[in-house]
Amino acid sequence: MPIRRSPITAAIALSLLAFSALAADLAPEALLKKAEAEQKPYLATVEQLVNVDTGTGQEPGLKAVSALLVERLKALGAEVETSPASPSAGDNIVGTFKGTGSKSFLLMVHYDTVFLPGTAAKRPFKVEGERAYGPGVADAKGGVAMILHSLKLLQDDKFDGFGTLTVLFNPDEETGSAGSKKIIAELARQHDYVFSYEPPDK
């Protein structure tokens, strides 16, 4: 995952602008500056997530990361609900924020990976030059962290220009989302805009 200032800060800023475009008092330049300051804590969150094995079906790691995500969402002020992603291991996590606007947004990404148990211990998160490495660093724990830190910056700015802002973290995307596709479809139908934080193929 590239960690040059511009890709990370631009991604966070664009994530913020998706919502802040609804509010005239949030200037893009100011958001970019805040996003630049958020790079270090963002990478710390990525490291925390990457260093736990969450291969699809690996219940201990999925449970640990699920607890962390629930804690982080609640700290940001979300109303949080979890439900088993049966027949998959792990929980679907839904965090909901209520605002003063009219439009609804869904932010979604998975927190499982394709890696075997023990991979995180063998090659933990590291930064070399302008790249970060580790199991799931791009697909998609970087996206999980992107959502959390975008929400933090919105909260810091006291921005509530949305009607409903919903976050969905699912634990089984890498094997087809058997235990989460239903809730994904249901939530998508309920929102005006849906943002997936899955990385592009290239």
Which sequence ranges carry the predicted segments?
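Bacterial N-terminal signal peptides that target proteins for export
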Residues: 2-11
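Acidic/histidine-rich catalytic neighborhood of metal-dependent amide-processing enzymes
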Residues: 140-202
